[in-house]
Structure formats: C-alpha cells, structure tokens
Amino acid sequence: MEQIFHEIKINTKGQGLYDFTNETVSWLNKQKINNGILNINILHTSASLVIQENADPDVLYDLKNFFDKIAPMDNKLYKHTTEGKDDMPAHIKAALTNNQITLSVKNKKLMLGTWQALYLFEHRIEKHTRALSHHLIGK
C-alpha cells in the first residue's frame, strides 16, 4: 500500500463553478498507483467541492442561483461582516456543500459517471487562488 500527496492550485475569477477534473486526472495518470482511494480536500472555508453534471451549463447556473437565494449577500442578516458582504454567505454555502470528496480509483481511472465532473465552487466575489490537497492511497 502506498500513499501520495499532491496539491493543485485553481485560480478563480470570482463566484462560480470551476471544473478541475482534467487537472486531477492528468496528475493521477502519472502516479504508480493503479487502484485505490483518492481524497480531495479544499484548504479554505469560503469555497467548496462538488461533483456535478458537466454536460449542460444551465445546471451550474441554476446551482449557483439556488445557493445565492438561500444565503443572500445582505449584511443586515449577519454578524460576521468584516470581510465584506460576500464573506458570511460564502461560509454558509461552503457549510452546506463539501470541503472534501473521496472517490475510488480503478485502473488509474476516477470512478465518475458519464456526466459527472469535479468542481471547485467559489463562493466569493473576488478572484482567489484555491489550494486542493490530493491524497491517493492504494497499490
């Protein structure tokens, strides 16, 4: 059994969903491990990770709009406002989604469905560089 750690950086342009599947698959293909488990963890509290459909961009649009409605940018609603009107809503959205994803790896392939992709869900308005820790365990 082996373990490999790796970190990728994703540059966001503000709120939205950013597909990082290709970066992860590219890294995975270079590893000696053929079968195992891959855990991906985002090292931030105002962005998150989701597995979502990659075929119809309307899915991503609707997902973002849904979360904007349940966690609106209105400082009157929140006590934590020192980092801007988007900060507390970003924390709420991150709490309602995932900060880590675990996937099986079989024959060097991520076990994703046909229409599934890995997304970083940026909840802040401004651009950020987000770090994603990859921990691969297997043989």
Report residues per predicted region.
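Active-site histidine-anchored catalytic micro-motif
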Residues: 1-139
